[in-house]
């Protein structure tokens, strides 16, 4: 029974009408995102939540207009009962003229976005217009504000064709990007009542005027500030360089965004700058000279995104936060130093992602977290020293960089090594001082690195799937005495073509037998080193299960013997890609064989003894487990098309070999 129509549910659907059944109690106005064919909406009269009048959807008492169909009409008079126009109510519609009702109080976010409104008079009754309400109305050339509003929200008139804006006395604040990307806007008149302007609220090169008693100031560089020049709001004229006065403590969001001619920012001596907000210098592609003041505590999201000419950044003692994508794409950035950082500091996701020239990274002892993708794709970064204060390294944090050595300082507070944190670091060979505090090594953590050996930290309890996948140089894997390791994921040694030995001298959870790693009572074989020289392997009757991917890629194995009354379950891909494997027997005790167990075992041509004659069991071996049809036939029945005839290896031979 349909009860809810969620956002984007009918995205780009070319429908002209829609009917809402009685039980629908939730309707997202943007469910038709990208569709401009809808002409009318109808509704079951017994629906307790919604009502329809003239093809337009309202709440039951018609106080909220929920959805105006995109292709309904070019002119519309909103009923007198309506007090609220809902989120995305008219979005992307053909409406050109609208008459507001006398009781209207609120217009929600994006209500008229991407419509064809030409001019707009906001009634005095309206007190609240939410973000983006008239964004991208590219036919809108004039707006008159009512007396009920006190603020203009973020993005409210962004990307319109307004030519002049006169802000009335009742408005005290204008949000971020409220009139940004308005290419025809040449003049803005502000009242004396304005106390707050958001970053990039107007386009550059606009003529802004305000009375002498306004709480704003404009310097000869055409930089707009608050009255005391504590907050730098925006720059109104493009130039190659600017001097920031010592009074400034905050640079507002998008203040210098996309100033592609800007090459230099100079901060006056003694400046107490604390915050550089989001997108402040976004896309300043020629900015090469900037010395961050020691007083800065935080950098906003993308504040220096794609500043491709910045070469070095030295952070000061007050730093506490570098936000998401802050320096992402700064492809000339060579040196990043946190050595003066005296306060606990976090580095958010993607902060230095794609800084392909970064060679020198110095992290201070006060860095507490490095989030996901933070230093990913830093193609010149060769060495990293992890400070003892660092508690968290996010997924992909250093992935796909050229790091050759990672050194952990002690005593470390590190608990987890996250998924993919050092994956694809194809030059990483040395991990120095791996902390004993680490409890979890997550999936793909060291995938495709060049580490030659690995000692599991004593406090580690779990290692995730594919943790060492593709570590082609690893020869030895050690679980030290008293190590707390209990859980080992699947495929952790996939592609470890040199791993010939697993060591586990004294563990409460594991034991080594015949080169393989078992659980403590030897009832479950967990994994076998892919590069082991052992060619024949015989299970003992004590073994009851083989874990998934246990023998994955063991290319030296020729024969495997499973005794009667032993193994009952073989996990998925357990013997996959054992390319030399020519013989294995499957006794009646084996009840469950998972998928892809024999995938890639191209030498299992014939002579495989399968005692279970059940058609369904054998069918599953072929269709799910990857065993070929001919493998269960006598080798004498196979035609000469097979170059190598296969002869089953006798049980007695296998037992003698293992004993030797």
Predicted regions and their residues:
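Short, aromatic/basic amphipathic alpha-helical patches
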Residues: 201, 617-628
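Consensus positions within tandem repeat domains that build extended binding/scaffold surfaces
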Residues: 6-9, 29-31, 67, 86-89, ...
């Amino acid at each position: 029974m349909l009860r809810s129509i969620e956002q984007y549910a009918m995205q780009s659907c070319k429908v002209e009408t829609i009917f809402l059944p009685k039980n629908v109690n939730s309707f997202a106005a943007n469910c038709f995102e990208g569709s401009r064919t809808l002409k009318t909406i109808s509704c079951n009269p017994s629906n307790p939540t919604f009502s329809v009048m003239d093809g337009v959807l309202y709440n039951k008492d018609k106080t909220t207009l929920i959805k105006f169909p995109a292709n309904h009409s070019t002119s519309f008079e909103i009923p007198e009962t309506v007090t609220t126009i809902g989120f995305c109510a008219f979005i992307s519609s053909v409406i050109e003229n609208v008459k507001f009702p006398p009781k209207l109080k609120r217009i929600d976010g994006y209500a008229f976005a991407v419509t064809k409104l030409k001019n707009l008079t906001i009634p005095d009754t309206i007190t609240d217009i939410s973000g983006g309400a008239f964004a991208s109305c590219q036919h809108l050339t004039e707006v008159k504000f009512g007396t009920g509003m006190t603020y203009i929200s973020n993005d409210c008139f962004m990307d319109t064709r307004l030519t002049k804006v006169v802000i009335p006395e009742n408005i005290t604040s204008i949000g971020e990007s409220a009139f940004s990307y308005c290419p025809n806007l040449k003049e803005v008149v502000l009242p004396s009542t304005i106390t707050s302007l958001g970053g990039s609220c107007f386009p550059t090169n606009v003529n802004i005027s305000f009375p002498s008693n306004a709480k704003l100031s404009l310097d000869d560089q055409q930089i707009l500030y608050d009255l005391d020049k504590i907050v730098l709001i925006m720059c109104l004229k493009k130039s190659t360089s600017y001097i920031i006065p010592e009074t400034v403590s905050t640079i507002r969001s998008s203040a210098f965004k996309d100033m592609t001619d800007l090459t230099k920012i100079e901060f006056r001596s003694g400046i107490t700058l604390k915050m550089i907000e989001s997108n402040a210098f976004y896309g300043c592609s020629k900015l090469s000279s900037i010395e961050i003041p020691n007083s800065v505590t935080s950098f906003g999201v993308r504040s220096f995104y794609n500043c491709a000419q910045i070469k070095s950044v030295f952070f000061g003692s007050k730093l506490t936060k570098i936000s998401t994508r802050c320096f992402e794409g700064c492809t000339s950035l060579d040196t990043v130093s946190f050595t003066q950082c005296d306060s606990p500091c976090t580095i958010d996701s993607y902060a230095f992602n794609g800084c392909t020239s970064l060679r020198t990274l110095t992290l201070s002892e006060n860095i507490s977290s490095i989030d996901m993708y933070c230093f990913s794709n830093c193609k010149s970064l060769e060495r990293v020293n992890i400070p003892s204060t660092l508690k968290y390294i996010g997924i992909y944090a250093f992935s796909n960089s050229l790091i050759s050595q990672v050194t952990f300082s002690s005593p470390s507070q590190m608990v987890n090594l996250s998924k993919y944190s050092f994956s694809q670091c194809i030059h990483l060979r040395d991990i120095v001082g791996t902390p004993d505090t680490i409890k979890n090594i997550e999936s793909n953590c060291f995938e495709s690195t060049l580490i030659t050996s690995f000692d599991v930290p004593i406090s580690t309890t779990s290692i995730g799937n594919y943790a060492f996948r593709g570590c082609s140089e690893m020869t030895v894997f050690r679980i030290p005495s008293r190590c707390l390791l209990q859980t080992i994921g699947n495929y952790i040694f996939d592609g470890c073509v040199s791993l010939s030995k697993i060591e586990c001298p004294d563990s409460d959870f594991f034991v080594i037998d015949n080169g393989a790693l078992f659980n403590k009572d030897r009832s479950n074989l967990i994994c076998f080193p892919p590069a082991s020289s052992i060619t024949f392997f015989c299970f003992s009757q004590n073994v009851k299960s083989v874990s998934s991917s246990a023998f994955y890629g063991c290319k030296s194995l020729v024969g495997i013997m499973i005794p009667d009354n032993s193994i009952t379950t073989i996990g998925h891909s357990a013997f996959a890609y054992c390319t030399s494997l020519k013989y294995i027997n499957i006794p009646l005790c084996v009840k469950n064989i998972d998928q892809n167990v024999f995938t890639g075992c191209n030498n299992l041509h014939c002579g495989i003894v399968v005692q279970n004659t059940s058609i369904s069991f054998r069918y599953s071996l072929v269709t799910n487990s990857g065993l070929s049809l001919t493998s269960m036939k006598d080798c004498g029945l196979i035609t000469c098309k097979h170059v190598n005839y296969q002869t089953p290896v006798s049980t007695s031979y296998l037992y003698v070999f293992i004993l030797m």
